[in-house]
């Protein structure tokens, strides 16, 4: 993983979606979730700590399901809040959801009380949202921000903090304020411009075994 992403080419969200389509035969979601679990384990510290994971209704939620499965296997006390409908998940996310269930995971639908969270993971929307976050999802974003502040724990966003425009770097209303962001395949301009630096924290790129420049020309 690259911890100096600003020194590498940046890609618009549409370009990243194109790369994902071209590389659809590769296990990108599994790679993303494993990379997330690796970074989460480093941030959280000792196994056994309580980890709160917010999983949304799309592929960002799928990445969260994979990360949750790997963290459970490493001994972390994973509490996964699923804010979606399992019957309407995209194909790869549905597979990740079922593997989490088959491994003994139990999704919940409300944030539980915990003595102390060791880490919170935002897997609600990433770069996939084109509108302000509202309703139950907005409530989860506000809860995650408040809990991270209260516990003084890291808040890790997957790909892009939910609510932040990955291309332009402005917030669409309620937005995750991450201490760390693990972005996949390549960096996005909005992580480093506008509101991005204040909401992304430390940005790390997980290339997922892809060289983005071989697929699409970078934006910058």
Regions found by a protein language model. Name each.
Residues 2-17, 23, 117-220:
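YjeF_N-associated NAD(P)HX repair module
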Residues 37-126, 132-158:
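Nucleotide and nucleotide-moiety/phosphate-recognizing core
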Residues 1-52:
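An N-terminal, well-structured beta->alpha segment
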Residues 18-21, 93-100, 218:
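Charged, low-complexity, helix-prone segments enriched in Lys/Glu/Asp/Gln
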């Amino acid at each position: 993983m690259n911890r100096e992403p600003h020194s590498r080419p940046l890609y618009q969200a549409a370009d990243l979606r194109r790369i994902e389509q071209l590389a659809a035969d590769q296990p990108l979601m599994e790679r993303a979730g494993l990379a997330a679990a690796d970074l989460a384990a480093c941030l959280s510290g000792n196994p056994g700590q309580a980890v709160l994971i917010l999983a949304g209704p799309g592929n960002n939620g799928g990445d969260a399901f994979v990360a949750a499965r790997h963290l459970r296997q490493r001994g972390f006390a994973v509490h996964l809040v699923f804010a979606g409908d399992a019957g309407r998940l995209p194909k790869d996310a549905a597979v990740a959801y079922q593997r989490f269930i088959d491994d003994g995971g139990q999704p919940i639908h409300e944030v539980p009380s915990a003595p102390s969270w060791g880490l919170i993971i935002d897997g609600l929307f990433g770069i996939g949202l084109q509108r302000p976050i509202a309703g139950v999802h907005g409530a989860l974003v506000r809860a995650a921000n408040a809990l991270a502040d209260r516990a003084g724990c890291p808040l890790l966003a997957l790909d892009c903090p939910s609510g932040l425009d990955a291309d332009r770097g402005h917030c669409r209303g309620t937005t995750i304020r991450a201490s760390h962001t693990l972005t996949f395949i390549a960096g996005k301009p909005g992580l480093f411009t506008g509101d991005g630096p204040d909401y992304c924290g430390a940005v790390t790129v997980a290339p997922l075994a892809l060289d983005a420049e071989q697929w699409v020309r970078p934006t910058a």
